[in-house]
Design a protein with these regions (language model features):
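Internal low-complexity, small-residue/proline-rich segments
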Residues: 35-354
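N-terminal single-pass transmembrane signal-anchor helix
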Residues: 7-41, 51
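N-terminal leader/signal peptides at the extreme start of proteins
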Residues: 1-12, 73-76
Length: 354
């Protein structure tokens, strides 16, 4: 009977070689895995915009118009005020009933104004997953600051639901020619249920600020204050006009809990009325280059605060996603031609998309 062959052990050099090979394989595979995950997140983001587009078109089929931008940034959606001029909430609230979020839309329905103010606290703290880009943050409430709310009590800790998507406010500047056509906190609480009574609703000059003439002159997008836009008003064609797209957000604010006014327009609830938290613009071909630079779509980063309240952008590399007024979803390059992008924001400029 022969003696057994001695088992040969790994040498230290061989072990180090194996570890090095494994390290190289991980280094090669990890970027591919990360890229695949980001591609999946970006695709999910596109699906969210598809849902928003379809919900908006379903609302249009039901009511005859797109959702209005609401009354102002201190008002949230009211379940007893329909979806037209009488609705103080913004586009995000208007489409809830068509996004499998009917329960959130109906919070406080039929209650007295005082009881409803308490009930709507729940609405403000109820995120809709489709309003969040998974490349940026999960669907959860985050700090919004101690803001005044006209028709609702603030949630505990001032933690609101947010939105990563913004309606198309147009290719005009929010404030032009010195006219007061920018943002408003909206009318006083007395307006609820009494719109458009001048005695009840002209607080903060609301009715004088957002007249039909001023809307037609200064607001050429598809989501505007007070007045819902009809598809027939989109004279440039629904396939040539942005409905909603990803908004730029400084990455410092993804989950920051200590900011107040320094928020780059991410400090109000998703369902509030017209505000640059939920509206952005395409004025990238403005005559003044400094003004135009504010509106250039930009990838999220932790340094760009200039123009952060008015520009579109995303957490994706190279592109941001947008849904058009026909419900289609497109990925738009950050290198998009300035004139072309500006035209995509106007509902009736008559210009041909290059």
């Amino acid at each position: 009977m022969g003696s057994p062959t001695p088992r040969r052990a790994f040498t230290l050099v061989e072990l180090l070689v194996v570890i090095a090979i494994i390290g190289v394989l991980v280094a090669l595979l990890l970027p591919a895995v990360q890229a695949a995950r980001e591609a999946a997140r970006r695709n999910q983001c596109s699906n969210h915009l598809k849902q928003i587009g379809l919900a908006t078109l379903n609302l249009e089929s039901s009511s005859g118009a797109l959702p209005s931008g609401g009354w102002g940034y201190e008002w949230t959606g009211d379940p007893d005020s329909g979806t037209g001029e009488k609705q103080p909430g913004g586009w995000g609230f208007g489409i809830l009933q068509f996004m499998e979020a009917g329960a959130t839309f109906s919070v406080g329905k039929g209650q007295s104004p005082a009881d409803k103010r308490i009930a709507l606290t729940t609405q403000l703290a109820t995120p809709v997953p489709a309003f969040y880009c998974p490349s940026r943050r999960p669907p959860a409430t985050s700090y919004g600051g101690p803001h005044t709310m006209v028709n609702a009590n603030r949630p505990a800790g001032d933690r609101f639901c947010k939105t990563d998507y913004a309606g198309n406010g147009g290719s005009n500047s929010p404030v032009q020619s010195g006219a007061l056509v920018g943002f408003s906190q909206g009318p006083a609480f007395t307006c609820l249920g009494k719109y458009p009574s001048r005695a009840s609703c002209n607080g903060n000059s609301f009715l004088d600020t957002y007249t039909a003439d001023k809307i037609n002159t200064y607001f050429n997008g598809v989501i505007v204050p007070r007045f819902p836009i009809k598809l027939k008003q989109i004279e440039d064609g629904t396939s040539n006009t942005i409905l909603c797209a990803e908004k730029y957000l400084n990455s410092r604010y993804y989950a920051r809990e200590d900011f107040q006014t320094d928020s780059c327009s991410d400090n109000n609830p998703a369902y509030n009325g017209y505000d640059w938290d939920n509206i952005r613009w395409t004025r990238t071909a403005a005559t003044d280059p400094n003004e135009a630079a504010q509106y250039v779509p930009t990838p999220d980063n932790d340094t760009t605060d200039y123009g952060c309240t008015v520009r579109f952008g995303s957490a994706h590399a190279g592109v941001f996603n947008a849904t058009y007024c026909d419900g289609s979803v497109h990925s738009i390059s950050y290198d998009v031609d300035a004139k072309e992008f500006q035209l995509l924001g106007s509902r009736s400029d008559g210009g041909a998309i290059p």
